[in-house]
């Protein structure tokens, strides 16, 4: 991978990370088209740190409030009043606990299915299937769901279901935001609430995954045939951070005025295009380097 290709992949990451269209699927597809090979799970996870840093910058006031209220309730002057220590009556502290609960599914599944995620699940036929299925689901749910829940209405049950939706993004093509937004809309959250919860809930999971992959890359960079090198990877990460911040602003304005129908149609169209490219042999379903890594 050269630096120009890294810049392109950084742009692709920034444009697709927050939208319910699957950034990992786009990185996989563009990587094959430009490089002739899959950039790999490590590259994908590390450049996602860039887009997540953009989330932290944009939502910095919310994040500071969540952390300060959470610590204040848990370790403050609430004494033996465990309901108060768990955030009763404090929306920010409660949201902090909900983010923790919502992170549990992806942590468990991410660790237990790590080898499958990095190899078998990167088959493009799987990507095509989930792009199509979750595109249809997003379209149906968004069109029919009620819109009466805000971020302050989230329960532990809802948080866990959000987490299950997020964990589906371990399969390239599902989309982390697509999974959580679909669940949120199905549970009756407004479009704005669903997308904001999706952003905040992703922070622990994406940072955790990115840091673990970075540590692995440091240890194995000489023997990992799929890792493109630190120079291109860091360039892509910086590009994804800068452009990602702009995309967040535009996406939040979009969902305040429009439905997710356009994204659902895009997913279905992309699934058809990738399927055709697979059939005619332009794209390989499984990259040879992934097979070797397995």
UniProtKB/Swiss-Prot annotation:
It is a multi-pass membrane protein. It catalyses: di-trans,octa-cis-undecaprenyl diphosphate + H2O = di-trans,octa-cis-undecaprenyl phosphate + phosphate + H(+). Signal peptide: none annotated. Pfam families: BacA. GO terms for cellular component: plasma membrane. One of its GO terms (molecular function) is undecaprenyl-diphosphatase activity. It comes from the Bacteria. Belongs to the UppP family. Bacitracin is thought to be involved in the inhibition of peptidoglycan synthesis by sequestering undecaprenyl diphosphate, thereby reducing the pool of lipid carrier available. Catalyzes the dephosphorylation of undecaprenyl diphosphate (UPP). Confers resistance to bacitracin. This is Undecaprenyl-diphosphatase. It comes from Bifidobacterium longum (strain NCC 2705).
